Amino acid sequence: MTRPLIAALILSGTALAQIKVGQIKGPLLDAHNCYPYHGQHTDRLDRALSLGFPVAIEQDVAFWKGQAVVSHTPKTTGVEPTLKAHFFERVRPLMEKALKENKKSQWPLIVVHFDFKDLQQPLLEDVWTLLGEYEPWITTARKTADPAKLSKFDVRPLLVLTEEADEQEAVFYNKVAVGQKLRLFGSAHTKDLTARATNYRRWVNYSWRAVEPEGQPKAGNWSEDDLARLHALVSKAHGLGYWIRFYTTDGFTAAENQGWDAGYNFGSHEAVLARWKAELEAGVDLIATDQYELLAKFMKPGK
């Protein structure tokens, strides 16, 4: 791919992000796995919220005795915090302040992304009910009779995303009556993606292996071919009306590791900064990382 074509894709991708993705003022830092592991790393959510807004936050969700909890595994033990306590009540002061100030041009302040580790219907229904408790905070859209007709968002301080499983669509979309509010929005199936965004499926969620198939630990230097794959994916997603997220790009040493997955690690700041630069220039809407502070610093104007 020639540099002029890459430059054109950068401009067109960014423009599409601004036009079609007006409710996510991206690119955004996406705080990956932003919850405790086995009682450790309990400061992750506070760290993410301290970096300023807007920000995206991932919460992995499982089930324990009838309640949604945040957990990296479906094998819950009862020590996991509830989704309600860990996330919703933690952000309550921020949401109430935002509603009082009513600075709608700055909304959403937080994009929360649920990664369900368990798809049993009672869990999904519990989360739907939980979202109903906090609906005044939540960006919604009316269900249309035709899924291909996207209704406008009623933008609030919080936008809720979930992933691609059809089991989720059955509860979060199919059971909702036409004209009623959708409280969260799923991702599209990315395999052989050709369909445009629907009223429910508004984003796409790619593993970084779609860009560098060898995976982060085995990746070599960032290349023109890698850049071309990245821009092709972003351009296609935006052209079909989707927001786009990539997971997960890290670059840390053993001494820096705070319970992070080695499978996402390029091994150095230099290596991950090259990828972040490319993601920012390509107009990726949600850039997932475990190194919240490092990416936040890199994203500051002038960096």
Q: Where in the sequence are the language-model features?
A:
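Boundary at the C-terminal end of the N-terminal hydrophobic targeting segment
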Residues: A7, A15-I19
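Phosphate-group recognition and catalysis centered on beta-loop-alpha active-site segments
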Residues: Q18-K303
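Sec-dependent signal peptide recognition
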Residues: T2-A8
